[in-house]
């Protein structure tokens, strides 16, 4: 029976970790709506998440749209169905690729930065100092980041949708020889509000998860510089996994009927 002990220990540790994460997320959500508020900190995080992430999100989106159009042309040309390319590009970008890829880029950039910053504050006792000064660390450090993540990632995804569809348009017009007006007509004819809304809902969920994992792993880091590095890695990996899992859940809610 000794071989069952590591399995049981791992299982209960996982449950304990899930419980801590759930309590942390609940506390962070409550502190978003409970005063005092820190608008300057929220604005700072919005700029960090939104404005400074635009280049990497834009580059990812435009080349994703171009590759998607090129790959679609390669497949559809065998069946003389090239006219379906605008439809495939706009649906794929708005429903899936825009929200998921933009959020993964944000997770790699912002999730790591949050974990490193808060983790450094933890190992250097700055968080304990905030508590000593009667400042709630959850309200001061975590809530502004969660609010900024929920607010700015949907905006980034909206930009990614536009840039990604534009990338597919550019490649289709200048390389594949599509008629510009026909391509735009097919794109707008097939674009549905539900597709955009589902992508933005996903983006809000993803933004919350990215900020949550960055704050959680940074908040619970220990062991000096090595611990901060581990927390940073764990934040990016866990945020990426949760993005993919929640992507399926939200897709099921929107499109299973």
Q: What residues fall within each predicted segment?
A:
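Short, membrane-interfacial amphipathic segments enriched in basic
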Residues: 1-40, 217-218
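Loop-to-transmembrane-helix entry motif
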Residues: 36, 45, 49-57, 92, ...
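Hydrophobic alpha-helical transmembrane segments of multi-pass membrane transport proteins
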Residues: 85-128, 213
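Start (N-cap) of specific transmembrane helices in multi-pass transporter permeases
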Residues: 136-157, 231
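Helical hairpin unit composed of two closely spaced alpha helices linked by a short loop
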Residues: 232-246, 250, 254-257
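Active-site cofactor/substrate anionic-group-binding motifs, chiefly glycine-
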Residues: 47-101, 105
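Membrane-interfacial helix-loop-helix connectors in multipass membrane proteins
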Residues: 71-94, 162-204, 208, 212-232, ...
């Amino acid at each position: 029976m000794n071989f069952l002990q590591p399995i049981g220990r791992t299982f209960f540790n996982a449950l304990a970790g899930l419980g801590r994460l759930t309590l942390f997320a609940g506390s962070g959500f409550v502190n978003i709506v409970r005063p005092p508020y820190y608008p300057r900190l929220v604005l700072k995080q919005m700029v960090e998440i939104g404005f400074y992430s635009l280049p990497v999100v834009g580059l990812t989106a435009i080349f994703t749209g171009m590759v998607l159009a090129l790959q679609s042309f390669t497949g559809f040309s065998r069946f003389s169905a090239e006219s379906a390319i605008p439809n495939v590009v706009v649906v794929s970008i708005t429903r899936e690729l825009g929200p998921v890829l933009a959020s993964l880029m944000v997770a790699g950039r912002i999730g790591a930065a949050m974990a490193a910053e808060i983790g450094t504050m933890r190992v250097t006792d700055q968080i304990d100092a905030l508590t000593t000064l009667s400042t709630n660390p959850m309200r001061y450090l975590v809530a502004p980041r969660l609010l900024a993540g929920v607010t700015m990632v949907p905006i980034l995804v909206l930009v990614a949708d536009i840039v990604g569809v534009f990338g597919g348009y550019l490649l289709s017009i200048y390389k594949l020889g599509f008629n510009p007006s026909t391509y735009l007509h097919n794109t707008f004819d097939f674009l549905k509000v539900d597709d955009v809304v589902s992508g933005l809902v996903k983006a809000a969920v993803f933004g919350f998860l990215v900020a949550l994992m960055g704050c959680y792993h940074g908040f619970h880091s220990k062991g000096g510089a090595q611990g901060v590095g581990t927390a940073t890695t764990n934040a990016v990996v866990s945020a990426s996994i949760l993005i993919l899992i929640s992507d399926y859940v939200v897709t099921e809610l929107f499109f299973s009927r």
